[in-house]
Amino acid sequence: MATRKLKPTSPGRRFQTISTFEEITKSTPEKSLTKGLTKKAGRNNNGRVTSRRRGGGVKRLYRIIDFKRNKVEVPATVASIEYDPNRSARIALLHYADGEKRYILCPVGLNKGDKILAGEKADIKPGNALLLKNIPVGTIVHNIELYPGKGGQFCRAAGTYAQLIAKEGKYALLRMPSGEVRKVLATCCATVGQVGNIHHENITLGKAGRNRWLGRRPKVRGVAMNPIDHPLGGGEGRSSGGRHPVSPWGMPAKGYKTRSKKKPSSKLIVKRRGQR
């Protein structure tokens, strides 16, 4: 997978880059594995904004992805590699030997026609899913469960992976993409390999409208607001805000650590991210 640069026919296209989509083998999704997607616009069940600067964007069909990989010891064939508008990674359509069809995240090196398997008997190759206790130390994995049977929650974005660096009793130690080293129960499932579409990080949007297609709205600076809207707001003319940068609720920005020290999961973090 690679990117290509567009011809500068307008200011918005001058620096714009897009994916070549050369790995895509099918243009329409499997109808039985799709459903409608209601726009949330950053609101919760009370209708209040919980994620700012969200709204709009193109209409999408949601592809139902198998993050649990709980169909064990049944071989599957990769029928197609498809585009998914709801995530940065590509997805692979699997046809199982018993006739069932499922989508999974497409890792690097997985191609149409390949055979994959989930379970204890699976080989250590991209796309196969095993429990962490059955994966050799040093292997890179993605779609990692945090709780057994809940489904993968870590390393699902394009190009991401974690490395299994040790096993200690009932825990496996993983080095996460952020550099954090944390313990995860060895009975959790993970998929071997790195998530595909690794050149996604090289894409340049080129214009504001392309962000709007993705459902991202403009970010207004605090110093440009009124005093009632932000701690940095107000003042005559342009001002610096008069204090250190903070969030709209007064929490210091620029590197202030906000993680609660009382979290039970703190004992599972061996090394925090960002530390040498």
Swiss-Prot record:
Residues 256-276 have a biased composition (Basic residues). One of its GO terms (cellular component) is large ribosomal subunit. Residues 29-54, 224-276 are annotated as: Disordered. Keywords: Ribonucleoprotein, Ribosomal protein, RNA-binding, rRNA-binding. One of its GO terms (biological process) is cytoplasmic translation. InterPro entries: NA-bd_OB-fold, Rib_uL2_dom2, Ribosomal_uL2, Ribosomal_uL2_bac/org-type, Ribosomal_uL2_C, Ribosomal_uL2_CS, Ribosomal_uL2_dom3, Ribosomal_uL2_RNA-bd_dom. One of its GO terms (molecular function) is structural constituent of ribosome. NCBIfam families: rplB_bact (TIGR01171). Belongs to the universal ribosomal protein uL2 family. Part of the 50S ribosomal subunit. Forms a bridge to the 30S subunit in the 70S ribosome. One of the primary rRNA binding proteins. Required for association of the 30S and 50S subunits to form the 70S ribosome, for tRNA binding and peptide bond formation. It has been suggested to have peptidyltransferase activity; this is somewhat controversial. Makes several contacts with the 16S rRNA in the 70S ribosome. This is Large ribosomal subunit protein uL2. It comes from Maridesulfovibrio salexigens (strain ATCC 14822 / DSM 2638 / NCIMB 8403 / VKM B-1763) (Desulfovibrio salexigens).
